[in-house]
């Protein structure tokens, strides 16, 4: 563990804990706006210390960092990615997400609304369905699209990529904000081969609020000269896994925050 990593761990350990049931009751935020930042780990440690009075950290069985694995689904021609890249007002992403090595797993869909807010819907599924584009996933996505967009699925989904990372979750004491801090983020293709990762020493911080904006934590980030970035894990994953698609809108973020497989080996 580096000195920087140790500083971040110590800052996380100094925060007051919150249990999962209390966090979900206080700030479910399934309809929200997200603001994202790429933050050096040293700055993240300062951030956690600066937010100790206003935020608590999720703790489960004594742990404060948790492994996540999300598999994203799209059509063969990446229609969902293209809708995102073209900035369509109504666009969505489908995935399954597994928490750690245990059985907890969900089907999830994130739907962008016309006014910019994002709605996240999810339902529990068996862990063996993680990464599988079966009929249960198609039915869940179809129902969600009909409820919120008035139209069904209309395309065949297949697994396109997987993203793994270690996450720390904070919640504000007033329940207005939820903040996630992701590190050790790796992108894998459908065969499980690594295609890229978040640069070592960086964290992807997301501030989630009902109305958008940086929140109190964003103000602390601005005080360190850090500004929001426009990215999605799926968009970055496609750019790293399918470079033939092109990702001109993500070029700056990719260069500053991520490295491909060739660069990792160098």
Which functions belong to the PLM regions below?
Residues 1-266:
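Phosphate-end processing signature that detects enzymes handling 5′-triphosphorylated RNA
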